[in-house]
């Protein structure tokens, strides 16, 4: 009887110990589940942060590409404007050369006209002298008439030359007028081009400032990219660590659940043994 009681007490003690171990396993399993849920939540948070960082990185790279494209367009526009200015300067130089040649032709025609006018004046003076002078003899008169005819012929030739010179002078004046018009147009175009060049210069300064700002922004973007890349690597490392922690915790939970099942099985067996012992005790009494 004492042996049975001792056995029952031992079984009861073992049962209590099994209950304590079962409760301990349940608490450990609960804590492990909480740690696993917390680790999964941290992993999801890290994944969201990684996605946000990747989106920021894509947006930064897109802005950098847009700024570079605008800068290339401004540089092409500046090159085109410089080419137009060079072509117009060449045209202005050619117009100036045409004007110089026209002025030379005008000066030559004016000199020839002066010579013809002087010859005509001299012939007229000679004719008047011959008319006023008393002619002594017929031979002298014939000679004077011949001289007069020659002088008239020279005067007619001078008139013809004068007309030709006047015609050429009119042509030269017309050419000069057209050249002056072209020169005025060229000067107006020069003023316009100078204004455009000033605007282009201002735009170039703005572009230089924009380029400097773009370089600063590019450097900032590069620093941001480096920072984001570092943060991304750190987040990935933390995510991998969290994933490994979750896996480790999951294994611990599985182990504790297995122990809990084993302890429950032992508890059931002890309960069965106690029931059997009580039955045997009752039967013996």
Curated annotation (Swiss-Prot):
<keyword id="KW-0677">Repeat</keyword>
<dbReference type="InterPro" id="IPR000533">
    <property type="entry name" value="Tropomyosin"/>
</dbReference>
<keyword id="KW-0514">Muscle protein</keyword>
<dbReference type="GO" id="GO:0006937">
    <property type="term" value="P:regulation of muscle contraction"/>
</dbReference>
<keyword id="KW-0020">Allergen</keyword>
<comment type="function">
    <text>Tropomyosin, in association with the troponin complex, plays a central role in the calcium dependent regulation of muscle contraction.</text>
</comment>
<protein>
    <recommendedName>
        <fullName>Tropomyosin</fullName>
    </recommendedName>
</protein>
<keyword id="KW-0175">Coiled coil</keyword>
<dbReference type="Pfam" id="PF00261">
    <property type="entry name" value="Tropomyosin"/>
</dbReference>
<dbReference type="GO" id="GO:0042803">
    <property type="term" value="F:protein homodimerization activity"/>
</dbReference>
<comment type="subunit">
    <text>Homodimer.</text>
</comment>
<feature type="coiled-coil region">
    <location>
        <begin position="1"/>
        <end position="273"/>
    </location>
</feature>
<comment type="similarity">
    <text>Belongs to the tropomyosin family.</text>
</comment>
């Amino acid at each position: 009887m004492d042996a049975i009681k001792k056995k029952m007490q031992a079984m009861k003690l073992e049962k209590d110990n099994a209950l304590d171990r079962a409760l301990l396993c349940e608490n450990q399993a609960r804590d492990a589940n909480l740690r696993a849920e917390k680790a999964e939540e941290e992993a999801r948070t890290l994944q969201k942060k990684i996605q946000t960082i990747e989106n920021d990185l894509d947006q930064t790279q897109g802005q950098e590409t847009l700024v570079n494209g605008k800068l290339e367009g401004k540089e092409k526009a500046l090159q085109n404007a410089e080419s137009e200015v060079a072509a117009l300067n060449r045209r202005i130089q050619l117009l100036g050369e045409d004007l110089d040649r026209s002025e030379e032709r005008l000066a030559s025609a004016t000199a020839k006209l002066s010579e013809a006018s002087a010859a005509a004046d001299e012939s007229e003076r000679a004719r008047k002298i011959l008319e006023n002078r008393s002619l002594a003899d017929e031979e002298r008169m014939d000679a004077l008439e011949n001289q007069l005819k020659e002088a008239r012929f020279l005067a007619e030739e001078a008139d013809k030359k004068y007309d030709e010179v006047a015609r050429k002078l009119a042509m030269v004046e017309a050419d000069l007028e057209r050249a002056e018009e072209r020169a005025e147009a060229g000067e107006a175009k020069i003023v316009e081009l100078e204004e455009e060049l000033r605007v282009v210069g201002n735009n170039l300064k703005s572009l230089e400032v924009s380029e400097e700002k773009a370089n600063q922004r590019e450097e900032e973007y590069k620093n941001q990219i480096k920072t984001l890349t570092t943060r991304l690597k750190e987040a990935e490392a933390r995510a991998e660590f969290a994933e490994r922690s979750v896996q480790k915790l999951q294994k611990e939970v599985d182990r504790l659940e297995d122990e809990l099942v084993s302890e429950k099985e032992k508890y059931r067996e002890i309960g069965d043994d106690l029931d059997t012992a009580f039955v045997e005790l009752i039967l013996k009494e």
